[in-house]
């Protein structure tokens, strides 16, 4: 009898554990129809996923011959970062092409006819419809042959993807010659100087890295000369900034780096992506974060939090006052503005303890999705 109860208890605990793991690690296989062809992808929902949050989406494409599961497990695992930074990670699956390769198809003279552009377009629509994802914050990255595909997406889907990231791949010459993006797009590129697959200085098929950077700087109408920052470990970051909408071109050069997915790639890519919407970014002098940079409680935008901010909030509420950032007035971050917000600010000022919801005390973007306007704010 004791053994029976023990087994029952063990089963109950296992069920609880399984439920907890299912809630914290939601990997969902999905399919989508692309012109009569069934395409597969896997969706990772971050912990405590709520469709009301309208999260951004990062599509991650592996190298040639790799399944999405392999890329997720052994190279581009974005799941911990998705939990921490609140985004949905998607791992698309390539099709077996006419040459027997589980490879992504690139547009151009060597195309196998597989519609990868339509695949991305269909996945974006599905993520918006099925998970209420934010259509303004769709991002894609790829490694090796998956990285080569990103150049097609940058050229063909700049009005769908806010930014793309490319690791260990340069543009094919034919991709550049046919590239006419509908609008500027954020570009972040990671490449080693000893990469055998994507030669840093180009070859008969791919363009040199400096030519590629100049091309995208021209597309984004940035400054012609980049800033240069050492990242340590032989890595140097070059950034072309100050284009319209602050669309940036960023290039990480890895001195003596080979054809690999570097360990810093996930964080570097997301740091870049997280600034973007389709309309712009927050990188470079004079640029504000894409969702509107502000400091919660700093209602008058003077860079500090004091009694005048509470007064400004009350004037806004009851006397027709104007503010440049409604999100800054939302002191309790509940997505609405009322007397409770002024009370929250006053409580922080005079209680001597506690804090306000982020972004606070530093300036930043609002991680809470709401209808409050803060896009034209210049307070920080």
Question: Which role fits each region the language model picked out?
Answer:
Residues 4-16:
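Sec-dependent N-terminal signal peptides
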Residues 21-57, 88, 138-171, 175, ...:
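A domain-start/cap signature at the N-terminus of enzymes
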Residues 27-48, 52-139, 148, 152, ...:
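Serine-hydrolase catalytic machinery in alpha/beta-hydrolase-like enzymes
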Residues 189-191:
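Short beta-strand/loop motif that positions the catalytic acidic residue
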Residues 194-198, 259-260:
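Acidic catalytic loop of the alpha/beta-hydrolase fold
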Residues 265-282:
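Catalytic active-site module of serine/aspartate enzymes centered on a nucleophile-bearing elbow/loop
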Residues 282-380:
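Cellulosome-associated attachment modules in secreted, modular CAZymes
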């Amino acid at each position: 009898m004791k053994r029976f109860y023990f087994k029952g208890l063990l089963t109950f605990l296992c069920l609880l554990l399984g439920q907890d793991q299912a809630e914290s690690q939601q990997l969902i296989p999905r399919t989508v129809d692309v012109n009569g062809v069934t395409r597969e992808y896997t969706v990772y929902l971050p912990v405590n996923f709520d469709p009301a949050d309208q999260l951004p989406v990062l599509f991650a494409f592996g190298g040639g011959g790799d399944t999405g599961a392999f890329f997720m497990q052994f190279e581009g695992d974005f799941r911990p970062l998705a939990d921490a930074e609140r985004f949905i990670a998607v791992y698309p699956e390539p099709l077996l092409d006419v040459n027997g390769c589980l490879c992504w198809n690139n547009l151009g003279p060597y195309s196998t006819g597989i519609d990868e552009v339509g695949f991305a377009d269909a996945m974006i629509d599905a993520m918006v419809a099925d998970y209420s994802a934010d259509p303004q914050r769709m991002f894609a990255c790829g490694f090796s042959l998956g990285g080569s595909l990103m150049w097609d997406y940058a050229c063909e889907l700049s009005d769908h993807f806010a930014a793309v990231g490319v690791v260990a791949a340069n543009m094919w010459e034919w991709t550049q010659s046919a590239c006419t993006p509908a609008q500027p797009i954020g570009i972040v590129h990671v490449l080693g100087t000893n990469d055998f697959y994507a030669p840093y200085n180009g070859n008969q098929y791919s363009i040199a890295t400096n030519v590629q950077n100049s091309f995208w700087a021209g597309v984004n109408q940035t400054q012609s000369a980049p800033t240069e920052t050492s990242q340590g470990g032989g890595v140097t970051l070059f950034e072309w900034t100050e284009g319209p909408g602050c669309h940036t071109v960023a290039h990480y050069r890895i001195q003596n780096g080979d054809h690999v997915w570097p360990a810093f790639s996930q964080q570097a890519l997301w740091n870049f992506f997280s600034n973007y919407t389709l309309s712009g970014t927050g990188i470079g002098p004079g640029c504000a974060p894409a969702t509107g940079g502000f400091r919660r409680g700093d209602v008058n935008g003077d860079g500090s939090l004091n009694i005048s901010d509470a007064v400004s909030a009350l004037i806004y509420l009851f006397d027709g006052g104007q503010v440049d950032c409604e999100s800054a007035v939302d002191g309790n971050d509940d997505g609405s503005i009322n007397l409770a917000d002024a009370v929250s600010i006053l409580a922080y000022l005079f209680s001597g303890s506690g804090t306000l919801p982020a972004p606070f005390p530093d300036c930043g973007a609002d991680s809470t999705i709401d209808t409050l306007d803060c896009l034209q704010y210049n307070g920080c």
